[in-house]
Amino acid sequence: MRHCDSFCELIPMKGCEAILEWMIDQGAGREPADIVLKGGRFLDLITGELVESDIAICEDRIVGTFGTYRGKHEIDVSGRIVVPGFIDTHLHIASSQVTPHEFDRCVLPQGVTTAICDPHEIANVLGAEGIRFFLDSALETVMDIRVQLSSCVPATHMETSGAELLIDDLLPFADHPKVIGLAEFMNFPGVLAKDPECMAKLRAFQGRHIDGHAPLLRGLDLNGYIAAGIRTEHEATNAEEALEKLRKGMYVLVREGSVSKDLKALMPIITERHAQFLALCTDDRNPLDIADQGHLDYLIRTAIAGGVEPLAIYRAASVSAARVFGLFDRGLVAPGQRADLVVVDSLEGCHAEIVLSAGRVVSEALFAARKPVAEVGRNSVKAPRVTASNFRSQSNSGKTRAIGIVPGKIITQNLEFDLKVGPNGVEPDLERDVVKVAVIERHGKNGNIATGFVHGFGLKAGAIASTVSHDSHNICVVGASDEDIATAANRLGEIEGGFVVVRDGKVLAEIPLPIAGLMSTEPYETVREALRKLRHAAEDLGSVLEEPFLQLAFIALPVIPHLKITDRGLVDVDKFEFVGN
């Protein structure tokens, strides 16, 4: 069977006509189907019924349901339920710390047959080259990876990124077959202020899909933002906010990632009435959580266990998601639909036993047949070497702002502490869980270093550091001592980026991420186990966070309220301005 996004896309017209004839004959039962799933039931997302029926597949399409079929290859699914493949509607594959090829291996066997990604992590480091890497990868993966073009690179001009993408940089990719539209428009102040570059991007993509990103934006300002042609929102963190955005015509993407965990708060809106306006997304989810909990299958299980009707959550996971993004060829178990199917043990359990992607049974052999894509972004960490003296506060006042971590959220608090002033300036207060945070520019542009304080990590010693630091991906370090902060930052330069845990000048655990300082060259299984060691090492330092490295990754994102830090200093996100310590 030929793999393509449409059965006619890569086939000459004569071949296309033949395939159409095969589909008609196999659907009508005149010829054996290529594949038949026999003996099970499927979930009809239109009526909500569980239907006992064979499912016939020709090439990459479902051609028959509500009947009995013969197949060239028959698969017994007795006692199981067949559901449409799951669609992750907003994610950053780089946050899994693996390449798109390894992400494919990691999540497709769990039922995610379509992923709509924003490559802005690698775009912030490499620019157009990073987007091209993702598009080239998307042409080779078994799952269908679709790409939203990164709209805000950098997210703001309050940080130093490795690249800047203007409208003229994006337009050459606009007609690529894997591109849907424009990715999350994070700079909502720029939209409301009618910033010229924001307006140029919005005008160019009018009539196409434009993703939103507007945490806590409400009232008339929200109306203005939506009026710009922005259709979706994944930043709603409570039911009241989500309902306002639904009432104003936005589609809400219910998010549950490794850090941003909004599913429980949004369960009240996941109903059969609202489901057609909802979809699911993970945003940022690492391979350790995927292995231990699952991906969208985990969201489905969790929602049903929390009282959500199965029909509502399965609609949000597939057909509603497909409709939101204009992918009308998938999302149902019905003739003519793309044969993206998941055979699960039960609706409540949602454990994938067999997965089909475009009519192909997912297996390691299928992954092994993919063409590789050349690596990009090596040696991208160009930060200056630092010493402890680079992180000493020069302030004479102990009254100090601190970023307050909110576990399970990327929103932070704007706190203030009265800290002791010593010979090296303002000192951390480990008893009150206040330690230092630093951001170091790593793209070789200016060598900026900014320092501040953070509350909520629980560190009693050492430091943890990362080059995964949204969105410009500079080095971000949190530590209890200046010496360990310096050691951790310098080690990241030596390993081409990644994650590091340090105590008393020694590296306790690390993961090199040499592809743009964001992704590993190793299989996801290797990354998963390295992440496990990193978590344990961070816990040994006193970390109380479930996901300390992804929590660290959002400290430098100045488009998420309330207090953040970039390489240029502390940012009051509510006022959208720099503030002093």
Swiss-Prot record:
Instruction: Give the residue spans that cross the bilayer.
Output: none
Could you confirm whether the keyword Oxidoreductase appears in this record? no
Any one GO BP annotation for this protein: adenine catabolic process
Cofactor names from the entry are: Mn(2+)
- Alphabetical list of SUPFAM superfamilies matching this protein: Composite domain of metallo-dependent hydrolases, Metallo-dependent hydrolases
User: Which keywords annotate this record?
Assistant: Hydrolase, Manganese
Q: What is the lineage of its organism?
A: Bacteria, Pseudomonadati, Pseudomonadota, Alphaproteobacteria, Hyphomicrobiales
- Give a single Pfam family match: Adenine_deam_C
**One Gene Ontology MF term:** adenine deaminase activity
NCBIfam families the record matches: ade (TIGR01178)
Which HAMAP family does this entry report, sorted A to Z?
Adenine_deamin (MF_01518)
The Swiss-Prot or TrEMBL record describes its family as follows:
Belongs to the metallo-dependent hydrolases superfamily. Adenine deaminase family.
InterPro entries xref list: Adenine_deam (IPR006679), Adenine_deam_C (IPR026912), Amidohydro-rel (IPR006680), Metal-dep_hydrolase_composite (IPR011059), Metal_Hydrolase (IPR032466)
List the disulfide bonds in this chain.
none
| Catalytic reactions on record | adenine + H2O + H(+) = hypoxanthine + NH4(+)
Q: Does the keyword Manganese apply?
A: yes
What species is this protein from? Brucella melitensis biotype 1 (strain ATCC 23456 / CCUG 17765 / NCTC 10094 / 16M)
Enzyme Commission number, as recorded: 3.5.4.2
Enzyme class (EC, first level)? hydrolase
Q: What is this protein called?
A: Adenine deaminase
